[in-house]
Amino acid sequence: MIVEQIMKRDVITLTKTDTLETAICKLKEFHIRHLPVVDEERHVIGMITDRDMKQASPSIFEENKRSLFLTRSVDSIMKKDVVCAHPLDFVEEISAVFYEHGIGCLPVVHHQKLIGILTKTDLLRTFVKLTGADQPGSQIEIKVNDITKSLAEISSLCQDLQVKILSVLVYPHDDPGVKVLVFRVKTMNPLPFLQALQRNGHHVVWPSEQRDLL
């Protein structure tokens, strides 16, 4: 999945000469937390967040400074070193950018012009859908040595039992030679599937026997 498939295209923006009062009004009106700052050609030149506004605002004991604060221009507090994404970036790789930089949103640019925006909320919503967690079902974790072989065998079992696979993920294990396959299947009663897995020699690690399902 790539960024352009999940980004928001209708981006609320500011110019560097807009006042901080304008920024506050837009944050409240559109219920957003991030405002890219663009020039006349929609090049991203900065970013303002609700956190930036709170940190720069006068304290409640300095109300006399508030009117002056509101008339300041956006470029007086905006972040100028803005990390951006490309519409063809992979969502998984962009997730790492969010994590490494500790940011809450990424402007999306094409030919150096702003065309969209991606937030942590967009990413979370996407991963919920990718994992099938938004659909009723059961999660089953299986420890494997050979991913390809195990996937083929387990997929065949699902077909035989008419169990629909919602998603498959591969997790690392403490043993570098082992992986954990995480299946989300569309059934609220996974017991027949779990029993079939065990009969065929697969090591089910979740649900475990102690969970009263097997």
Swiss-Prot record:
Matches recorded under SUPFAM superfamilies: CBS-domain pair
Domain CBS intervals: 7-66, 78-135
Disulfide bridge positions per record: none
UniProt keyword Acetylation present: no
Membrane spanning residue stretches: none
Function: Role in growth and sporulation on acetoin or butanediol. Involved in the breakdown of these compounds used as a carbon source.
Assembly information from the UniProt record: Interacts with YabA.
Protein name: Acetoin utilization protein AcuB
Organism field: Bacillus subtilis (strain 168)
